[in-house]
């Protein structure tokens, strides 16, 4: 809204990004207690897995879920004020955010209604993810310009692969994989949101560099016209995420639920697609990929041998079973996530 006023100060990306971040953060602190209280009154409690860590059944009982509502409400309001709402990348990102959040909301609602950890049936969840990812990646492919289907590789300046129409299923795979990986990782207070903050911060840097023709030319990365609005979008997401972490830090007063985790993964995955950072995203999301692989390995090995590789999957529960405290697991995973982000950002210059 402010951007459309045409004020000179609002033309500066860094100014709008800073205030989109601050606005979303402060709004989270203001409306957070009200949303938490409202969810408690509605008895929207987190439904815990019976096969999860036993201490979670007592420690996390009664904590409201659907915290994604808090994140995305604050992000959306901030974006209305600070973004160019006519920018195509802004519209794609909002579509992904609302679509995947809606899917997660249905899943959370069914869990609460049925009082079970089984919400939306897996096949219906996948169908929903396929539909939303197909339309969002399809729109990106149509409006994204001549290089939209090109994959750029770190370390190698001249090596590129143009997938053509196959970029659409490739992009869908990234969105769905990211969405489900974030969902699997959201099991401890502050874990998923803290890692998301690290990735969001890294993507803000990448978005700013790609929006500037001078920096893009110097670093030999694509200059993406219009990607400056991703800086604003991700800034608002950063502020909303910090605000949510304020209440989600141990001991959590609210959990993000599938409303938050499914959408967060898809949002960051879509940002990576727009910024032509698909390969870098696989490094940035290293912790999420490791968590997902731990589940896949556990299931496959157990089916064949009836033995478990890990004491419990996903991997963060394995370390809990080894005796690590919840905060030890969370902070150590944050550190590893930060290292992955540093590695990913360092590859931008090494070409």
From Swiss-Prot:
Membrane topology: Multi-pass membrane protein
Domain of life (superkingdom): Bacteria
Molecular function, one GO term: phospho-N-acetylmuramoyl-pentapeptide-transferase activity
Transmembrane segments: 17-37, 62-82, 85-105, 130-150, 158-178, 190-210, 230-250, 254-274, 279-299, 328-348
Database matches in InterPro entries: Glycosyl_transferase_4, PNAcMuramoyl-5peptid_Trfase, PNAcMuramoyl-5peptid_Trfase_CS
Disulfide links within the chain: none
Cofactor: Mg(2+)
UniProt pathway: Cell wall biogenesis; peptidoglycan biosynthesis
Keywords: Cell cycle, Cell division, Cell inner membrane, Cell membrane, Cell shape, Cell wall biogenesis/degradation, Magnesium, Membrane, Metal-binding, Peptidoglycan synthesis, Transferase, Transmembrane, Transmembrane helix
Catalytic activity: UDP-N-acetyl-alpha-D-muramoyl-L-alanyl-gamma-D-glutamyl-meso-2,6-diaminopimeloyl-D-alanyl-D-alanine + di-trans,octa-cis-undecaprenyl phosphate = di-trans,octa-cis-undecaprenyl diphospho-N-acetyl-alpha-D-muramoyl-L-alanyl-D-glutamyl-meso-2,6-diaminopimeloyl-D-alanyl-D-alanine + UMP
A GO biological process held by the record: cell wall organization
Subcellular location: Cell inner membrane
Record's GO cellular component terms: plasma membrane
CDD domains to which the protein is assigned, alphabetical: GT_MraY
First-listed, main subcellular location of the protein, grouped into a coarse class: membrane
Assigned EC number: 2.7.8.13
HAMAP family documented for this protein: MraY (MF_00038)
Chain's role: Catalyzes the initial step of the lipid cycle reactions in the biosynthesis of the cell wall peptidoglycan: transfers peptidoglycan precursor phospho-MurNAc-pentapeptide from UDP-MurNAc-pentapeptide onto the lipid carrier undecaprenyl phosphate, yielding undecaprenyl-pyrophosphoryl-MurNAc-pentapeptide, known as lipid I.
Family affiliation: Belongs to the glycosyltransferase 4 family. MraY subfamily.
Name under which the protein is recorded: Phospho-N-acetylmuramoyl-pentapeptide-transferase
